[in-house]
């Protein structure tokens, strides 16, 4: 019996010829990742273990991004703990300030993750790197601490679901809409502890940024990982960027899947996920009148330069509604600089936007755009749970950058064709 791409990567990192769903394996990790929320716990456990050194200073990556720039004394103390540990351990990949950014945009940009890698991160959206053809998954701080010490992680090999996307996308329909549509179909537990393998002619045509967006939200369907087999576009992205030699895996023709789900997305509209779950999706034509107070364009889901350009195309020559706070957050300093050099900031500022430094900030209700009771936001983020972006009586609607920009202009949820 053949293997899926997920099974092949896990087998290789476990030193095995093959791996099957349900197998318990110990696998060597290529990258162990932590941030300013999760790394402090892992560091405390590391200290308690009596370990002196991390297993490999080139493979432990620490990126403060959730409460940065630090918003208060507690967050400053957490970042200080991580900073001190990174310096003590002489980590090669410690990023802060003008060299940092939102971790799941930063690591691909810097080539720290690549095709064929096994990446574990103490952040649920570590699954983002599956867009590059890696097996990447979120773990708790305890597993991160163990990986920092041993270089290994134990995993149960997941079953895989194969998603096949056929047709051709309409204008303003992006990878974000594909994944929202998928989650809306299967539900937030529809891929529980499964590898979601995205395939088909539509995926083949997607640029890397949108592939990363799709993989990023696999966890919102309960997925253990989201993964796209690497191809010529992946190679083009990886060449001269990825610091380790990439390995291109592909599923065997006779690989076994728990399910195969096909979608013809030719007529798919931009999608909007209503509160308070990402599965509550509706096409833009069925949204109705939903006034809003804030728009967030950014995050590890949609904060890349392609997302900035998508928003700018809609905002050009337009202004945000007087009742809408438009906040734009480029995910890394490099994206920030590129957006500035391309003149996108002129467009954003002319539209009345606030441009934030790179941060996760509002996505988790941390800072830089918290909602009050009764307020609604359209966001290009990945979660819209109760209280996710602020008060428990606020609401978050998830959408792609073009829809978010159009909504800012309209003062209500709107599609680009409405502007």
From Swiss-Prot:
Q: Give coiled-coil spans as residue ranges.
A: none
Identify the InterPro entries for this entry. Answer: Acnase/IPM_dHydase_lsu_aba_1/3, Acoase/IPM_deHydtase_lsu_aba, Aconitase_4Fe-4S_BS, Aconitase_4Fe-4S_dom, HAcnase/IPMdehydase_lsu_prok, Homoacnase/IPMdehydase_lsu, IPM_dehydratase_rel_enz, IPMI_cat
Q: Which GO terms describe its biological process?
A: L-leucine biosynthetic process
The GO molecular function terms of this record are:
3-isopropylmalate dehydratase activity; 4 iron, 4 sulfur cluster binding; metal ion binding
What is the catalytic activity of this protein?
A: (2R,3S)-3-isopropylmalate = (2S)-2-isopropylmalate
Q: Which UniProt keywords apply?
A: 4Fe-4S, Amino-acid biosynthesis, Branched-chain amino acid biosynthesis, Iron, Iron-sulfur, Leucine biosynthesis, Lyase, Metal-binding
Q: How is the cofactor bound?
A: Binds 1 [4Fe-4S] cluster per subunit.
Q: Gene3D superfamilies under this entry?
A: Aconitase, domain 3
The pathway to which it is assigned is: Amino-acid biosynthesis; L-leucine biosynthesis; L-leucine from 3-methyl-2-oxobutanoate: step 2/4
What cofactor(s) does the depicted protein rely on? [4Fe-4S] cluster
Residue positions annotated to bind [4Fe-4S] cluster are 300, 360, 363
> Under which EC number(s) is this enzyme classified?
4.2.1.33
Its quaternary organisation is: Heterodimer of LeuC and LeuD.
Family matches, as HAMAP family: LeuC_type2
Q: What is the annotated role of this protein in its UniProt record? A: Catalyzes the isomerization between 2-isopropylmalate and 3-isopropylmalate, via the formation of 2-isopropylmaleate.
Instruction: Give the protein family.
Output: Belongs to the aconitase/IPM isomerase family. LeuC type 2 subfamily.
Specify the protein name: 3-isopropylmalate dehydratase large subunit
Question: What species does this protein belong to?
Answer: Desulfatibacillum aliphaticivorans
């Amino acid at each position: 019996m053949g293997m899926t791409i997920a099974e092949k990567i896990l087998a290789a990192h476990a030193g095995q010829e093959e791996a099957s769903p349900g197998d318990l394996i110990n696998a060597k990790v290529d990258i162990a990742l932590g941030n300013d929320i999760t790394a402090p716990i892992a560091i405390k456990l590391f200290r308690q273990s009596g370990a002196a050194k991390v297993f490999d200073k080139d493979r432990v990556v620490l990126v403060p991004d959730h409460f940065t720039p630090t918003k208060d004394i507690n967050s400053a103390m957490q970042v200080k703990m991580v900073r001190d540990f990174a310096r003590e351990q002489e980590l090669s990949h410690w990023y802060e300030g003008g060299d940092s950014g939102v971790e799941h945009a930063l690591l691909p940009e810097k080539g720290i993750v690549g095709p064929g890698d096994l990446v574990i991160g103490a952040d649920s959206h570590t699954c983002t790197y599956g867009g590059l053809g890696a097996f990447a998954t979120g773990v708790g701080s305890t597993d991160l601490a163990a990986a920092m010490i041993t270089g290994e992680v134990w995993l149960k090999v997941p079953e895989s679901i194969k998603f096949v996307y056929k047709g051709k996308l309409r204008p303003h329909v992006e990878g974000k809409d594909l994944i929202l549509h998928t989650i809306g179909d299967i539900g937030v537990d529809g891929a529980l502890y499964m590898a979601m393998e995205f395939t088909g002619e539509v995926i083949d045509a997607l640029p890397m940024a949108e592939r990363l967006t799709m993989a990023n939200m696999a966890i919102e369907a309960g997925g253990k990982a989201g993964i796209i087999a690497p191809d010529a576009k992946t190679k083009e992205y990886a060449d001269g960027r990825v610091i380790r030699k990439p390995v291109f895996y592909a599923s065997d023709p006779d690989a076994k899947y728990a399910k195969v789900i096909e979608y013809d997305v030719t007529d798919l509209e931009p999608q909007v996920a209503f509160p308070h779950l990402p599965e509550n999706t509706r096409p833009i034509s069925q949204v109705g009148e939903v006034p809003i107070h804030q728009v967030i364009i950014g995050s590890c889901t949609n904060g890349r330069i392609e997302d900035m350009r998508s928003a700018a195309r809609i905002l050009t020559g337009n202004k945000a509604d007087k009742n809408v706070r438009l906040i734009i957050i480029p995910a890394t300093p490099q994206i920030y600089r590129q957006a500035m050099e391309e003149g996108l900031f002129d467009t954003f500022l002319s539209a009345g936007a606030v441009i934030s430094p790179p941060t996760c900030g509002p996505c988790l209700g941390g800072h830089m755009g918290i909602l009050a009771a009764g307020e609604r936001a359209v966001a290009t983020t990945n979660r819209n749970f109760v209280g996710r972006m602020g008060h428990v009586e606020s609401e978050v609607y998830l959408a792609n950058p073009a829809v978010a920009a159009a909504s800012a202009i309209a003062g209500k949820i709107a599609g680009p064709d409405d502007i």
